[in-house]
Amino acid sequence: MSLIRSDFEHLLALRTGLRRFLHWSEHQARAAGITPAQHQLLLAVKGHPDAAGPTIGDVANYLVLRHHSAVGLIDRAAAAGLVTRGPDHANNSTVRIALTDTGNEKLDDLTETHLEELKHLAPAMRSLWRALEADGTATLRTAALTPAPNPG
């Protein structure tokens, strides 16, 4: 595959858009009184498909952390009153993570804000994907490199 300038422009636009969203998301988490990592943890717990809750290994996988780093994050979140640990009902040696009421409320508030922001970003992201598929560099620059309006 021979790379051309637009390949780099597309990759830059995609990474810039992702970084801007992540930066915004981190700011939202801090404004809610939690760290960005705690926000990701809360989302990993509530978004986990098993109603029993994720294991520490599941959390490590979702957050791309080593097991001991996930343990530390869970410890800090538990100390902050965001999550609890409990044994798995089928296997007492397995630890499951659950949200507290406080953790659930913070995540619900952040998720509402994030979904609203994603609705605003959706048109630009659709344009970006179309540009990536069609190699439309001008559309790509307009869609991804122009800051999104800040509602409110």
Predicted regions, residues:
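N-terminal helix-turn-helix DNA-binding core of bacterial DNA-binding proteins
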Residues: H23-R66
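Short, hydrophobic-biased segments on the C-terminal half of alpha helices
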Residues: I56, I74-D75
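Charged, amphipathic alpha-helical coiled-coil/dimerization segments
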Residues: D75-E133
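Pre-recognition alpha-helix immediately N-terminal to the DNA-recognition helix
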Residues: A13, R20, Q40-A44, E105
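N-terminal leader segment of winged-helix/HTH proteins
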Residues: M1-A32, A80-L82, D135-A138, L145, ...
